[in-house]
Amino acid sequence: STIPTNLPEYKIIIPTQTDKDKSISDSAKFYLVTCAPGAAVYERFGHSGIRVHDSVKGIDEVFHWGLFSFDTPNFIGRFIAGNTDYEMGVYTTKFFMLQYIERGSSVYAQELDLTTEQKHELYTKLWNNYRPENRKYRYNFIFDNCATRPYQLIISTYNYKISTNTQQEQITYRDIINKYVPIGLPL
């Protein structure tokens, strides 16, 4: 799911750190945040992000890849055709959580078991993703979205190599999705 960017101006959050101070303490904690689905079309599949909480530096932010604008010309047509550009955002955790509390959706956080070096590496990667030239991307329902972006950053930070069992039954993405999405999903 995503959060529209055309919210009232007072709700738009500016990152709390300047370019000169994008550092964390060694005691910072990182969480994979998963939000339950909501009723709106853009909420139907939930949302994900990465929370950084550092009480020493006063940081408590969620990095997420779910911003878009309904004001985009032909938004619905572009969305259906797979031509929608999304953007990464950085919100205070309080504001991020408020979005889901207001709509009655659950939010789950799983702490990532990172070494001190990995914490600093992931934080650098997050801010690099937020650079103006990196924050926009072409949304893809399967391959490039608010779940795959944090996944790729986390996996690359852990330096994991993931292998799959190639002996499994051949199944299409459509087969997988049809198990979870009712026919005639009200959009």
Where are these regions (language model features)?
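Soluble extramembrane regions of membrane proteins in the secretory/endomembrane system
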Residues: 2-187
